[in-house]
């Protein structure tokens, strides 16, 4: 009988690893079993996770984990979790570009790092002015010729336009008085990306080819010129592409990526002069504690063709102000999104050559 050839010995210093056939297949089968669950059961699981302490961060990460199982679980989670306008909660990255609630503001705060010109946005987790917070976005300031740009990203360690986490940017003119807000995604179907040289994005590492990556202008922020150096606070005006405040979430879904949503015009709320303190004052309801030229409140500008719009002039849609040397609060509500509010707040940093 022929002698059986023994297996070759392992290389010197090497290790012998036992290969178990089918491990990858078992993992795939397990994932398929999760994906084969009835949609109704998936939705019920997400509802129970949300109800069992998953309403606030950090426990809300369990809801996000459900959406990470597979595509069907993600669809189920997105269907169950209501947007910020209805729930008052920020859950998924997409929530950052959806309008906030109408009845109360989303309370956030910004931390500034002067050394590297970076700004970090956090969602407040308690009623305290500043707490540990849930990180939402970051922005870094860059000087590009006569312009200043703030690149906004979901990743605090990758603040570039080529990043998968790129959200958009804010770009100023030479004077620092006029800004344009750019979104990385088209606000509606057929929107044209900016063709300026600084907005072209070479070497993009984005994975998803379904939605074009670029810079789409979605808003402007302007500060009124003050060449005579007259005494008084800054004056601001904003024009943004936002859904109407009367739009429901279902209507927003129907019209998304179909047509322009129209402009929402905001102006700063005029402060009053405090004779005793000899300064301009606004009521920030305890959310701002340090006097600063950067502090502001924005309200909807009255439409001369709509008498009812004057009633909304007293509702503060965005307020921003200083509480420490490098900490600022930022509270926003419908129709603004967290991304829009962050971009407007960033415009308050830096020197306004013609305003100060």
UniProtKB/Swiss-Prot annotation:
Where do the record's region annotations for Disordered lie? 1-31
InterPro entries given in the database record: Tubby-like_C (IPR025659), Tubby_C (IPR000007), Tubby_C_CS (IPR018066)
Comp. bias (Pro residues): 1-12
Q: In which tissues is it expressed?
A: Ubiquitous.
The F-box domain covers which part of the protein?
Answer: 32-88
Q: Which Pfam families match?
A: Tub
Q: Where is the composition biased (Acidic residues)?
A: 21-31
Stated name of the protein = Tubby-like F-box protein 1
Organism per entry: Oryza sativa subsp. japonica (Rice)
């Amino acid at each position: 009988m022929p002698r059986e050839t023994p297996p070759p010995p392992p290389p010197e210093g090497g290790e012998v690893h036992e290969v178990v056939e089918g491990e990858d297949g078992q993992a795939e089968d397990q994932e398929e079993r999760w994906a084969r669950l009835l949609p109704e059961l998936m939705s019920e699981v997400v509802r129970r996770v949300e109800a069992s302490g998953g309403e606030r961060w950090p426990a809300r990460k369990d809801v996000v984990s459900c959406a990470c199982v597979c595509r069907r679980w993600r669809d189920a989670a997105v269907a169950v979790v209501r947007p910020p306008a209805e729930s008052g909660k920020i859950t998924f990255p997409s929530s950052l570009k959806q309008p906030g609630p109408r009845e109360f503001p989303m309370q956030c705060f910004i931390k500034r790092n002067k050394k590297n010109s970076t700004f970090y946005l956090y969602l407040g987790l308690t009623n305290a002015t500043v707490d540990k917070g849930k990180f939402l976005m970051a922005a870094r300031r860059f000087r590009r010729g006569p312009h200043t740009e703030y690149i906004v990203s979901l990743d605090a360690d990758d603040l570039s336009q080529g990043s998968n986490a790129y959200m958009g940017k804010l770009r100023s003119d030479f004077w620092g008085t006029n800004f344009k807000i750019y979104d990385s995604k088209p606000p509606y179907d057929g929107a044209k990306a900016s063709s300026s040289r600084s907005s072209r994005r070479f070497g993009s590492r984005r994975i998803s080819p379904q939605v074009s990556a670029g810079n789409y202008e979605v808003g402007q922020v302007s500060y009124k010129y003050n060449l005579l150096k007259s005494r008084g606070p800054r004056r601001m005006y904003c024009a943004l592409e936002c859904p109407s405040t009367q739009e429901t979430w279902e209507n927003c879904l129907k019209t998304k990526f179909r047509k322009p949503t129209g402009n929402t015009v905001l102006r700063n709320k005029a402060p009053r002069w405090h004779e005793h303190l000899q300064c301009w004052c606004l009521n920030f309801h305890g959310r701002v504690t340090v006097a600063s030229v950067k502090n502001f409140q924005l309200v909807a500008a009255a439409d001369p063709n709509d008498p009812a719009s004057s009633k909304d002039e007293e509702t503060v849609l965005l307020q921003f102000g200083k509480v420490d040397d490098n900490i600022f609060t930022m509270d926003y509500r419908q129709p603004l999104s967290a991304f829009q509010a962050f971009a407007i707040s960033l415009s308050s940093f830096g020197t306004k050559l013609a305003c100060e």
